[in-house]
Amino acid sequence: MEKLEISSCRTSDSTGYDRVWAQIDMDAVLFNMESMRANIREDVKIVAVLKTNGYGHGAAAIMKEMEKLSYVWGYAAATFEEAKELRENGAKKPILLLGYVFPYCYRELARLEIRPSCFREDMLEELSAAAEKEGKPVLIHIALDTGMGRIGIRPDDEGLSFVRKAMNTPGLIVEGMFTHFAKADEEDHGPTHTQIALYTGFRDRIRKELELEIPLCHCSNSAGIIEFPEANMNLVRAGITLYGLWPSSEVSRTIVPLRPVMTLYSRIVYIKDAGPGVSVSYGGTYTTSAEKTRIATIPVGYGDGYPRSLSGKGYVLICGKKAPILGRVCMDQTMVDITHIPEAREGSLVTLIGRDGGESITMEQLGDLSGRFNYELACDINPRVPRVICGGTLG
């Protein structure tokens, strides 16, 4: 659908949704992809990271836009179920699994031509058996731990033995090797330079001692794309920046311009006037003190992924003005103060994330207010919230 031009004090718009909805701007997705592409070599391709339902933005819809882009190599998911869902929704490009896959998934993984990350010898043996049963090879990416301390072989003699076994295991093809930066989003670049050196040194050992040229080498995550162009290799993995969000406050915001993809809306469903001494929400943590307080109820709460930790300190936007949250955010409802917004009425638009007139509230600002961070907030906007797609080639 076309991008919605929503007037903040109108009581109806042609969205088809009223309680709450997340508007997903595909034009912003494409802008962010092109912006990242401009900061990498022309021969480097991008992996669109679509785990956790595309960081809460809707993986299937974003995947369908990515299918058209020649510079997108494929997708990355965290779980087999996520990867399978992408295939079922029409993904033709390669899909890489970044986490562990349990053996009972291996045959279907082989059938769907999903690339697993490998870092345990038993995985090699069981994937080989699955490849034989399905009658097709399994392309694997070796996970290398250069400083993250989670999954991955180490860049040492034992790791080299693992690569040797992988390249000699029937039915398996070593297509790629990747590592993950632990501190690329921090001002101190030293630890990331160390990780890059460990990766390239191990890759060179593989070339020399095993005479193996791994086709796809990738290190850079979103922060790496921005701050470490020397780590681009063959592929880069675009995660949080794909959605127009920043990896951290320490990452440059001028090298790769970004546009937020998600705007979160609701509507006022009830307004009441309260005199002094009226408690609001659970626990009575807020009590009115003014002669008259105008309280609006919004049908959104932590059951939708809107943080309860915003209780008493967050705000929403109504008619281009900030409306502070009163008391505790409930599971399904939130109350705000609209005493200073006389034009607000039942049905008026509420912006929980996004811009309204001259005011805005970003995912990063919500994170600061709630004591969380933007990755978490985006992923927590759950399936109860409809995603309304606008813009792009399919919108």
PLM features per residue range, with description:
Residues 3, 16, 20-23, 28-31, ...:
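Active-site-proximal beta-alpha core segment in soluble small-molecule metabolic enzymes
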